[in-house]
UniProtKB/Swiss-Prot annotation:
Native organism: Arabidopsis thaliana
Protein name: Ras-related protein RABE1a
PROSITE patterns: RAB
Taxon lineage: Eukaryota, Viridiplantae, Streptophyta, Embryophyta, Tracheophyta
Keyword Nucleotide-binding attributed: yes
Coiled-coil residues: none
Recorded family membership: Belongs to the small GTPase superfamily. Rab family.
Gene designation per UniProt: RABE1A
Induction context: By ethylene.
Pfam families associated with the record: Ras
Segments of this protein annotated with the region Disordered: 185-216
Lipidation (S-geranylgeranyl cysteine): C213, C214
Length: 216
């Protein structure tokens, strides 16, 4: 028997799948842990494949269940992560403000997204480790903003360590996705239900493959 549409569940109004994408070491797992559990650690080992966490938030009187997938950033895992673009409603592109190569690789990640993700997927650019001393900064905030503007994305600098803008990033992309889904509901309800059935199914199958390891 097919699973009910995501919005038919009693404990939430919307189920939103998010991906954290970016090079290894930029702090994706730290951002995920800070947002989902309110904690921070530097003792991660490298993520093997994909792991995810869930947090339910409230926006405009609606309960939004966020299913947030943490992807490995290494090149050799990119074939694994491409399968998880399917069904993703939002993608957080993360770089390390002290590592210029991780910033330059954002364009490669965007190309990867354009090849494998839905055309309507929401994207947001995140410059992490903004708590680091300015002498260690390799990517000026203005450069991050310029790249975000080029691709029509919102932009935040964050720190998982100090909790700078972590809540704001996830709430911002969730709000934009909720609005997009609500607009779709208003135009064609059957189409929206179909999208959510697919997303729910994707989340179920992927959950069985998640790794117990975490990192970056």
């Amino acid at each position: 028997m097919a699973a009910p549409p995501a919005r038919a569940r009693a404990d939430y109004d919307y189920l939103i799948k998010l991906l954290l994408i970016g090079d290894s070491g930029v702090g994706k797992s730290c951002l995920l842990l800070r947002f989902s559990d309110g904690s921070f650690t530097t003792s991660f080992i490298t993520t093997i494949g994909i792991d995810f966490k869930i947090r339910t938030i409230e926006l405009d009187g609606k309960r939004i269940k966020l299913q947030i997938w943490d992807t490995a950033g290494q090149e050799r895992f990119r074939t694994i992560t491409t399968a998880y673009y399917r069904g993703a409603m939002g993608i957080l592109l993360v770089y390390d403000v002290t590592d210029e190569s991780s910033f330059n690789n954002i364009r490669n990640w965007i190309r990867n997204i354009e090849q494998h993700a839905s055309d309507s997927v929401n994207k947001i650019l995140v410059g992490n480790k903004a708590d680091m001393d300015e002498s260690k900064r390799a990517v000026p905030k203005s450069k991050g903003q310029a790249l975000a503007d080029e691709y029509g994305m919102k932009f935040f600098e964050t720190s998982a360590k100090t909790n700078l803008n972590v809540e704001e990033v996830f709430f911002s992309i969730a709000k934009d996705i909720k609005q997009r889904l609500a607009d779709t509901d208003a135009r064609a309800e059957p189409q929206t239900i179909k999208i959510n059935q697919s997303d729910q199914g994707a989340g179920t199958s992927q959950a069985t493959q998640k790794s117990a390891c975490c990192g970056t």
